């Protein structure tokens, strides 16, 4: 069903989303996942009670919520949001690079060493990591930089106590070189602000191109026992300009997302540093391809290993993601005082850090172990090599994008 004329006056209208259902996380994350919201139960017993009630009360008192607010609550509700209740890594729906192999953290440690050297070898050099999950990257990178002689300290930005406890246990004795804050507002330091697969969980405004280039926003409402999608006017005037830019490339009916939190986040990241770098690794694309290649948008939902059809069904029980618009992020970083470099793939970035040499060494070690009849050792090395190769696989993790930006610092080399 096409939107009715009521949408033009700013009143939300029921719409029928034409989104498909294609998995786009690792190993294959190239297509968007749509959702059919016509019959999604708001009373399912698996939906967290407090979150469900909060959403229903907000919609009842203020009307339909922009999808961005629904996504914020579903992921980050303090008691029932997805990231408030999940144990990092337990029942995960995909493997991140740090959880796949310790070699990712070891290679990233080389990047930190280059940064540390480029800004004059400060003591300490801080890594400020947002959304560190289990803490695998920190544990592996801290061990490697310690062997390199880099005086590294780690600052975790984590709002949930249970995740902090998990990270402390993962680090073990190295936790003595780390600290935990709830946001980026701590004392500014020299080092690097790091976010690995974090920005794709930033809540997004979902917009749809209407006739004559008009753009409308997706809202979420409750209708009886169901959450439903509605179309309405833009909820924030600051969306108008970027929405017009995207709509100029798209046909009526196409959808796209805008993350309104990126600008403020980049400002906070800049304020967290006296000098140093911003390092972002995530699924995403550049304009205009990110719009043209995903005409139904990129919002996707997952429960454990499975893609699920709707983010409106059982909020809090599943992850919700949207591909990162790295063109918009680079602009936000520049406005915040960073000097962004060209965006590259994780595959290209890891090649610059020596992954090919590591692969050769593992392959040679495995071959020699096999020649000597050390079957178990050869098997372990072969498995380690296979996992290393996955980091740069162009059909999977290697296709993640990497953005590095400097603040009052030279380009590392």
Give the residues covered by each predicted segment.
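Rossmann-like AdoMet
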Residues: 35-130, 134-189, 207, 348-351, ...
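Long, Lys/Arg- and hydrophobic-enriched amphipathic alpha-helices
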Residues: 240-413
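Low-acidity, Ser/Thr- and Arg-rich intrinsically disordered low-complexity segments
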Residues: 2-25, 29-30
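Short, glycine/acidic-enriched loop or turn micro-motifs at the edges of active sites
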Residues: 132, 161, 199, 285, ...
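Conserved protein kinase catalytic core
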Residues: 164, 202-203, 288
